[in-house]
Each structure stands twice: as structure tokens, then as C-alpha cells.
Amino acid sequence: MKITILAVGKLKEKYWKQAIAEYEKRLGAYSKIEMIEVPDEKAPETMSDKEIEKVKEKEGQRLLAQIKPQATVITLEIQGKMLSSEGLAKELQQRMTQGQSDFVFVIGGSNGLHQDVLNRSNYALSFSKMTFPHQMMRVVLIEQVYRAFKIMRGEAYHK
């Protein structure tokens, strides 16, 4: 079992890094965990739609280069399916029962994910209709994956 969180951009703030490290340690009891960061594309503050698409394309190529062919890709998208914590646990459990064991959760940059990445996705997951900073989403995601494993194992975890 392997969980990869693949994200555009680098975690800079110490407090985000500490939170991630804590959940990596906790999750390590259930699964191999890997965090992969790909560089975000340098871009001006204001861009045309065409320029935004070009940025997404370049970031998308970097993301896709990190995904193995056998991986189950779960993209984080505003338009994705919203699940409860129990729902995420059930989704992962069903996929594991089907023999899937290499999960890659993909978090895009500030402009979102390129269509090529969306096309590679096996499941589109949404945490909210709201937009969150991608650094924060890494922490929220890894916590929810940890919570899902606790639920799957029937272990207590605070609510």
C-alpha cells in the first residue's frame, strides 16, 4: 500500500511542514507515504486565458511525469465528488479490495489542473465548493487520508 500526495509548488512555512510531518508519521503505521512537489510555473499576476492554460499545461506535464502507469489517480477538484470522512474510507477500501494499492492524490497550483491531468484521473474528489490555499489542502488531505485508515481499521479517532 502506497499513498502519494503530488502537489504543485513548495511548502515554505514551517508550520505546514510540521503538520505534514506529524501526519506522515501517523500514516506510516498504515501505508507508505510520499510527498512529491513539482515546481509551479512562474507567471505574472494577471494573465490572459491563453496564458493561464499554458501555465496549467506546463505544471500538468510535471505532474504527469511523476505518475506511474499502474497508479490510481485521485485529483482534488472543486467539481469533484464531495464525500464524508466515512465516504472517503469506503471509496479507498473498495479500490483496495479491487487490488488497487498505489494511490496518487493530485493537488494543482493556483490556476487548477490541466485537462491532461484531469483525463488521467480515476476519481475526482472535492473537499468543498470553496477554494483553499494548496499548502493548506495538503494538510487537510493527509489528515483525511489518515482518518480514513483509522475508520477502515475500526480504530478510535477524535471527531
Curated annotation (Swiss-Prot):
Coiled-coil regions listed in the entry: none
Binding sites annotated in the UniProt record for S-adenosyl-L-methionine: L76, G108, F127, S128, K129, M130, T131, F132
CDD domains the record matches: RlmH-like
UniProt GO molecular function: rRNA (pseudouridine-N3-)-methyltransferase activity
Disulfide bonds: none
InterPro entries the record matches: Alpha/beta_knot_MTases, RlmH-like, tRNA_m1G_MTases_N
A Pfam family annotated for this UniProt entry: SPOUT_MTase
A GO CC term attached to the entry: cytoplasm
Entry keyword set: Cytoplasm, Methyltransferase, rRNA processing, S-adenosyl-L-methionine, Transferase
Catalytic function, reaction form: pseudouridine(1915) in 23S rRNA + S-adenosyl-L-methionine = N(3)-methylpseudouridine(1915) in 23S rRNA + S-adenosyl-L-homocysteine + H(+)
EC numbers: 2.1.1.177
Keyword Transmembrane: no
Cellular compartments annotated: Cytoplasm
Oligomeric and partner information: Homodimer.
Protein role: Specifically methylates the pseudouridine at position 1915 (m3Psi1915) in 23S rRNA.
NCBIfam families membership: PRK00103.1-3, PRK00103.1-4, tRNA_RlmH_YbeA
Family: Belongs to the RNA methyltransferase RlmH family.
UniProt name for this protein: Ribosomal RNA large subunit methyltransferase H
Organism: Staphylococcus hominis
Protein encoded by which gene: rlmH
